[in-house]
Amino acid sequence: MTLVIGLTGGIASGKSTVANMLIEKGITVIDADIIAKQAVEKGMPAYRQIIDEFGEDILLSNGDIDRKKLGALVFTNEQKRLALNAIVHPAVRQEMLNRRDEAVANREAFVVLDIPLLFESKLESLVDKIIVVSVTKELQLERLMKRNQLTEEEAVSRIRSQMPLEEKTARADQVIDNSGTLEETKRQLDEIMNSWA
């Protein structure tokens, strides 16, 4: 039996670090962000729907969607954010299910669905167990500002657009505290995976 694991966390909590550690173990990790990027590429149904919804102002000169422009629109407008999610989420969900089912058919021991907005999108039913990657509020803010070159105000706004990390950790089967060293994070992950093997 394949154990389907949901991997989630707050923005800039280090979820990608944990996902890469799982990949190094030879575990299939299905990344919702990568699938979401592919879903809005030219020629995909969601691409056309986004232009119909948001207009051609959000396009770059080569016709690709300007992620920064679209991001700025949806992070400050709840209705626009919901409209975008209504277009992108169904396409992403279907592709994730296809890939999950493929891993199950291949009798893999584990398959991981890496979904940043697992709880917000109410996708818990797609997985058997949930790991939340957590970090202190101070570290989260610092990492996000540095990684995305954001002002403190912009970073706080992005963090607030998601479910609070404390709420996510309360709903997890396991929590990895990623406030320390990589070795400490890896040790926690190894313990979890060994207990589920």
Curated annotation (Swiss-Prot):
Binding site residues for ATP: 12-17
Cell compartment(s), UniProt: Cytoplasm
GO BP of this protein: coenzyme A biosynthetic process
The keyword Kinase appears for this protein: yes
Domain DPCK: 4-197
Keywords: ATP-binding, Coenzyme A biosynthesis, Cytoplasm, Kinase, Nucleotide-binding, Transferase
Pathway, per record: Cofactor biosynthesis; coenzyme A biosynthesis; CoA from (R)-pantothenate: step 5/5
Glycoprotein found in the keyword field: no
Pfam families hit by this protein: CoaE
Domain of life: Bacteria
Entry's Gene Ontology cellular component terms: cytoplasm
Disulfide bonds: none
EC number: 2.7.1.24
Catalysed reactions, semicolon-separated: 3'-dephospho-CoA + ATP = ADP + CoA + H(+)
Major site of localization recorded for this protein: cytoplasm
Signal peptide, first to last residue: none
GO molecular function: ATP binding; dephospho-CoA kinase activity
Protein's job: Catalyzes the phosphorylation of the 3'-hydroxyl group of dephosphocoenzyme A to form coenzyme A.
Family per record: Belongs to the CoaE family.
HAMAP family: Dephospho_CoA_kinase
Protein name as catalogued: Dephospho-CoA kinase
Record organism: Bacillus subtilis (strain 168)
UniProt gene name: coaE
